[in-house]
């Protein structure tokens, strides 16, 4: 169980935010796990690279981790890969071509998740974020159908995060403002004020309508 000692040492370093040092120990643990029985080591190494914002390497390792699962990947594993692609697209190091490629892959994964678990808001919500990044001025409204689907599900959850609901409603309020449908825009800004009466953006938006 040599790999365990190496793995735990890496985890201690990671807990202290010493991610570069942790990676060295995780990589030693991967080599020591000669039977490939512990793919989670690869996943933890990917996470350490993610924390360093080295997304290409984080994605490379995460894909290796999924391969090691031999088709037994859970939907949560697929979700985390989609999230990695989304984070990579938003990083300062990605050029326009890379950003486009990352967003396409993220969109495909979140589309798959929303099809497999249509009653869960996460697939729609992250697909909305992905399309909002692809359409940063919101002129095409690419994120609109996904924010609408996410919002419809979030509104049925008693414990839904207010910030997630407000993100959906802010996008939709702004979308209708751009379309000059000011009455519909007001509906969403007023909904935000019902959740957060001091919301500065909603107040400013309503003053301008």
Predicted features by range, described:
Residues 192-193, 199-209:
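Eukaryotic acidic, Ser/Thr-rich intrinsically disordered low-complexity regions
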Residues 1-179, 204-209:
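Alpha-solenoid helical repeat scaffolds
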